Amino acid sequence: MNNFVILPILIPLLSAILLIFMTKNLMLMRIFSTAASAIGIVISGILVQTVFTKGIQTLSLGGWKAPYGIVLAADQFASLLVLTTAIIGLLVGLYSFRSVGEKRERSFYYSGVQFLLAGVSGAFLTGDLFNMYVFFELLLIASYMLIVLGGTKIQLRESLKYIVFNIVSSALFVIGVGFLYAVTGTLNMADLSVKISESGQTGLITVIGVLLLLVFGMKGGIFPLYFWLPGSYYAPPAAISALFGALLTKVGLYAITRVFTLIFIHDTAFTHQLMIWLAALTVIFGVIGSLAYSNVMKIVIYNIITAVGVILFGVAVHTPASIQGAIYYLIHDMLIKGALFMLAGTLIALTGTASLHKMGGLIKRYPVLGWMFFISAISLAGIPPLSGFVGKFKIAEGGFAEGEFTISMLILLSSLLVLYSVLRIFIHAFWGEEKETPKPNHRTAKGLLYPAAIFLLLSLLFGLGTEWVSPYVDQAAETLLNPEKYIEAVLKE
């Protein structure tokens, strides 16, 4: 039992509450929020290393042992995602200084960001489904506030769709959890794994599993449940879009990965095959969307959907290579989507438009921005040796090993189409005839580029430093592939 496990949740939660009382002092809010996020990175980094050297860390809150009490469990998969979340929180905060506007900043913006980070980290670390629901609600309430902050017409329109859709998904989550408790008498995920293997009610459990796949698919943006995503991520400022794009769909994917490698593993011939086909359709429709638009932000947003499909395929194939690849690609996508949203937001801020047809020749004025965008584009597409390559290659390798040749080829082909979709932005915006744009503001450009540059650097290091990263990813994959290790760590006391 390790009290350290709760700190990635507790620090942003307490910070969010304290930030509510600091709205009159903008500089204090910025400093405090940045410091809280930096401390979160340090704490999460220590947690990753502790899990690597000492194994899965658990904490039973209130002294109630599992499966009766609330348990937090940090395996390497959860710990790596918590660390990535903390990094994203810090960099989005830095980007916000120059992008969201003072009015939004004073309207409890930083408090909302910290509440969201607490909810995301809690969803990663919780050991039971009910508290996963609680943390989902915490991050969703924070996201409701952030998406409407500013009160523009498009924000109010898209937020209504976003809120209604998530209320429905949350209601279905409660129903699914209730059914599962009625059948098994427990909601602790480790205990559920044991009880389901002993229950013999495979048909009913499979139905509940499909219901939870629907719930997490709604939150993760899986076909055909992603229709809420493009508008909702497009409506708020770029900093909030970066936060949403890097984190929110990943929580849904994490939940799918956790429950379908730990709990619902009794009927993989049906559940995992269903996930494979949903993954393929998600990739196809994500690619179509990214090619159909000439709006910079919409192109980036639809590439989120493509990535969701790629990761889901890796989880569904469920081989050592594909699970490792899914973890690599999940972390890669969190980092590179953060960079791309920031770069797209910077591009829009400097040109005053999101339309590719109204951009051109920007490489002369903003060469650093141009080449940063190019590197982000090829990294997103998975061009070797950048970070997207390792994950996508391993996912395809696992798919080929399981005989999923057609969909594995689709995953590889999607790299070329993703590359084409984002290179359209690079070619139209930075090359060709220079279009009339607002007077250059190099001070603003630099302030916006620094956080994006750090994101891009981390993404490059993640790809080029595969040899250093792989032991951590391998350990994370091993726990997912051998759930008895997680079960033993949680139920041992």
From Swiss-Prot:
Membrane topology, from the record: Multi-pass membrane protein
Record-linked Pfam families: Proton_antipo_M
Subcellular location per the Swiss-Prot or TrEMBL entry: Cell membrane
InterPro entries found in the cross-reference section: CPA3_Na-H_Antiporter_D (IPR050586), MnhD1 (IPR004775), NADH_UbQ_OxRdtase (IPR003918), ND/Mrp_TM (IPR001750)
Keyword set, alphabetical order: Antiport, Cell membrane, Hydrogen ion transport, Ion transport, Membrane, Sodium, Sodium transport, Transmembrane, Transmembrane helix, Transport
UniProt GO BP: ATP synthesis coupled electron transport
Top-level taxon of the source organism: Bacteria
Molecular function (Gene Ontology), one example: NADH dehydrogenase (ubiquinone) activity
Major localization listed first in the record, in broad terms: membrane
Parts of the chain that traverse the membrane: 3-23, 31-51, 77-97, 107-127, 129-149, 163-183, 203-223, 227-247, 251-271, 274-294, 299-319, 330-350, 370-390, 407-427, 449-469
Assembly: Forms a heterooligomeric complex that consists of seven subunits: MrpA, MrpB, MrpC, MrpD, MrpE, MrpF and MrpG.
Family according to the record: Belongs to the CPA3 antiporters (TC 2.A.63) subunit D family.
More about this protein: Mrp-dependent antiport apparently occurs by a secondary, proton motive force-dependent mechanism, but the similarity of several Mrp proteins to membrane-embedded subunits of energy-coupled NADH dehydrogenase complexes raises the possibility that there is a capacity for electron transport that could provide a primary energy coupling option for Mrp functions.
NCBIfam families: 2a6301s04, PRK07691.1
Protein name stated in the entry: Na(+)/H(+) antiporter subunit D
